[in-house]
Amino acid sequence: MFCKKGPLSRGAMCLAVLALALGVCWVSQATASVNLPLHHWAYEAIERLTALGIIDRAMIATKPYSRKEAARYVARALDRVRKDQVAADGREAVAAPLLERLTREFRPELMDVDAVIRAPGESLRGIRYGGRVTTEMDAFFVGGGQTVRFRENRGGEYYVNGENNQTDVRGWLELGDWLSVTLQPKFISNRHVLGIGATNNSLNFYLREGNVKISHFNVALEIGRGTQWWGQGYHGSLLLTDHAYPLDMIKLGSEQPFKIPWLEGLGDWKINSFLTRLEVNRDFPRAKLFGMRISYQPTDWFEIAATRLTQFGGRNSPSQQFPNAIWCNYSQTQGQNQGGKCQTNEQGMVDFLARIPRVPYLVPFPAGVQLYGEFGLEDRVDHPAALAGIYIPQVFPGDSLDFRFEFADTDLERQLTGGANTWYNNGIYDSGMRYKGFPLGHHMGTDGLDFFIRTTERLTDKLTVGANLNYQERARGLPVHEKKREASADMTLMINDRTQFTLSYVFQRIENPGQITSIDPFAETFAAGVTAYNNLLWTTLSIQF
């Protein structure tokens, strides 16, 4: 179907698809492994080791990735340390404890790739399993008469006035190297944690995540519920984050990065795709969403990726079904948002990450800096959005202080041309690129600005503290829009290898706070003249077994 005789552009597309497909399957070893949940501490640890140059090559912007992929990155670092390829120049103050903790976390996977020595009597197991219990105690005060406030990057959750408890159990099972299963039920003591009003929720128990993954020849097929984060952003990403409720998906992609046969010198590639069905309560009930992401790392210090989301179908929609609707839009050359069978809502994005080494006087930091960015389009080239950031993994030699600054803008079009209300919206699909009212991408939503700063410091081998500052404006194209000033602090204590305790506090001052008042069509109402002072305190205890 995809390689019928046609224009040159179609032939080039087919050739590219065939080359990438061959590369995906060129990795002969099947490596099915459970995914690390988003916001697992290992993601930040691996990113920091990569930014420090301890891990010399890693594709880390597409999440989740598996425990075995994480172990391969850790194995690269261990190998470089053993070969004395990492200079003792002060980076070890940060890298050594991180690498030690990662080695303990992924010891079974590291034994499988011969990166650590297997202890006597410790054999390779055909069935592997594990679990984690997490309980959170909340004490929230949401001011301004609002009672709730959306919680950023938390799977469709809200801060809710009063004391609440959230507890989940995450269990996983791996069978050989071809099958993995994950299940994560969750309890919330207050149903409004998952919605109120237009987004109302009536459940105290729900399935946070549950999926089955089959892998063979580096091709991974995953079916079930889960969350994804596609992009370089830390505080948010333009197209796909875990801000909205978890999606029920079919995912297909490469289990690990690969090289194209006979063109290995070009670098590493990775492909991810998914298909999901959205909720009933929207413009076109049960509309579909297809996403594809191609990541490319030509060299150790640079990574680039392209992402495209296509919303189509749904009850009473004239558009074709999958895969014809996708091919109809991918192959056309006359722009998007065509009527009839090609009727869709689309977003596209290109993102990059570059690691800049230390340069005396210009880049004075011991391990240099990471620069990253995203540039997105909503349906057309005249609907842009952008995100840019800088990450310094070690500010001072021999110290563990890091620093991050990130800026995101979905209000570019209004500032440049006066056009407003485009990002995450659509003239046909008027519930927009959202799920249960929440944007699939950045939590600031339409016509937003977001400035974010974070720094962390490891005080002891077991205790780390962090602080954030955030200024955000939402819906700047409306006469009344929201302005938020936020400061927060957190403390994480590793009680032992399997037990972690976190204490977090957030203060928010929000002018004209907004609440979702309709999903079909989407509408958000801002309380003019109201200033909400929110005090948000919570503790989290996580135990692995």
Predicted regions and their residues:
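Signature for the C-terminal beta-barrel architecture of outer-membrane proteins
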Residues: W178, W229, M249-D430, T446-I453, ...
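N-terminal secretory signal peptides that target proteins for export/translocation
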Residues: M1-R10
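Surface-exposed loop and membrane-interface regions of Gram-negative outer-membrane beta-barrel proteins
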Residues: Y159-E163, V181-H216, G231-T241
